[in-house]
Amino acid sequence: MKGKKTVLIILDGWGHGDKTKSDAIHHSSTLFVDSLYKNYPNCELKTFGEHVGLPKGQMGNSEVGHLNIGAGRIVYQDLAKINIACEDNSIAEMENLKTSFAYAMQNNKALHLIGLVSDGGIHSHQNHLYKLCELADKAGIKKVFVHAFTDGRDCDPKSGKGFIKQLEQNLFGAKIASICGRYYAMDRDKRWERVKLAYDLLTSGIGESSQNLTESIQNSYNNGITDEFIKPIISVDENKNPIATIQEDDAVICFNFRTDRCREITTVLTQTNMPDFGMNTLNLNYTTMTNYDSSYQKVNVIYNKANIKNTLGEVLEQNNKSQIRIAETEKYPHVTFFFSGGREIEFAGEKRLMVNSPKVATYDLQPQMSAPEVTATIVAELEKGETDFVCLNFANPDMVGHTGDYNAIVKAVETVDNCTKQVVEAGLKNDYAFIIIADHGNADFVINENGTPNTAHSTNMVPCFALNSGFNNIKNGKLGDIAPTILKIMEVETPTDMTGEILIK
């Protein structure tokens, strides 16, 4: 047979739940996806832990998922790598960490540690922060301040108070200078008015004054504000003055290892003046845990990413195949940068289509998001029948899953079921093969045992369907098996770098 043009649809956050009330997918009307189980070869994929290069049992996420899918192998992740480095103390030998410490010591400057404080393991891990506090203390730095971003998204919405209490036990002489919800400090959608609240807190100490941080967090909870949305809180001394703000010439380490959500705060602190928002850069000795953006000037990086060679996109380029990457804003970096193994620029023959995500405060307010527009855009492309490979992401089950709003999650799932149907029908008419998968679960586990909303990802298996592929059998696997499977359908030789298995036969 001649290789087939193939569409990969990633249903972001669509896992196999336990079919109880907590499983919003099971309680949604998903007639189309239900029909796929009956009519096409299907299997299950593992998306978490050691199956995607994370520590055992650690839930997967979109960045890790798309990296593994595009690479066609297990890609060992920063979380696992940095965990080991903290355990064996090899992090202490990292050149740019030593440089940051030496700068603070020699110039008698404050060292500010900024980032997400939780055990979510998606963007950061609190253990890495504890280690930095310990090493700064050993280095003899006297002025060490933590600016904590609270989570409530990759872990329970009211877990932040407990994480701050744990941090207070692991400061090694450092002090917590401020607290702010990730909604403001870790925006990634150019909502600069949100970022400004975090910027003003960090640089000017503008926020609610507090001498008891856990009490202030509890007050937020009492007012119906959960971790993600906690308004800026500044720690003050007995004279009501901030104990620390980030000043010109200070040292800053941003300890998030995931690259996307501390880009904006780093940009306004170090790269780009934004006079319209009253945000100007400071002259800082600024260090990040990983490389957030290779275009940054004067930002030091502790761990640079290894280049991933021979990703699916690169192999298609080598074989003169055309490809489309399409998603709405929220998942656009995932189908481009991450799917291409951390590469920003397009491959030859690659077309990128981004549909703007709706400008709403949270996606439970518009659970269909921009899926209908994404659908219309890609259907028009499939009807031309010209493109050899398409990677398409539907964001809804994940992004609405993070809100914890049950009815909205059901609407999101039903939207994606309907949109997937339209894409598949258009593709099959033009003889496309389809692989339909998820990168991790979320909407399949939305209520905790105690009845509270679960807004984090799940470690459930996810579905994988093969439509019109020319193969009738498919076996269970992992995300790193998808690229070799697609190359098999397209009759393109799999490079030896792709150690994933071919799931169809």
Feature roles, as predicted:
Residues 1-505:
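Feature captures the catalytic ectodomains and active-site-proximal regions of enzymes
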